Amino acid sequence: MNKVKLKLFYIGLTLLLLQSCSHKMSYSSITEPIDDKKVIALSGQRFPWVVEIEQRLKNKGFTVLRYSSVQKVTEKAPDKDISYQQASARYVVQLNGFAPLEWAFRCMGGGYKFNYISAEVIDTKTNQSIYSFNDSGYSENCPPVSGSIFTDLVDGINGLWKN
């Protein structure tokens, strides 16, 4: 009986240590919340986990575009015409990360084990990075070591906007 308890203790300790390997970092450079429509474009490769982030952003009220397209706008005035490029989304989320997609490396619940994931929100009007997120470890749906990568990322982006 003591050997069983000792094995369970070591298994629990190992799982606890694996969970603590995650390193989370986020940074926001805005001082005032964004008072604009929740329209953003996602930039980066279209991995399966990007769909998870996109869906969570939509659940928070965002309109998510695949690209921030640009159209030429001309405003006519009596004395002159003004032409400029107008983007369909002022804010772009640049996503980058690596999580193995092979079945042998996926979590049983459908989650992912990220070697790294990073996201940067860029204001295309000022060409400034206004939010940065970096993490590694397990995403949601990875029992028994599930993390909160997607939730933390989406909550961080949502927190930039005035609700």
Task: Report the location of each language-model feature.
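Sec-dependent bacterial lipoprotein signal peptides
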Residues: 1-23
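A generic local structural motif
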Residues: 2-3, 26-30, 78-81
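A structural "domain/chain start" motif
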Residues: 18-75
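C-terminal/domain-edge helix-coil "capping" segments
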Residues: 22-33, 56, 128-163
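Solvent-exposed, acidic/flexible segments
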Residues: 43-50, 110-112, 139-150
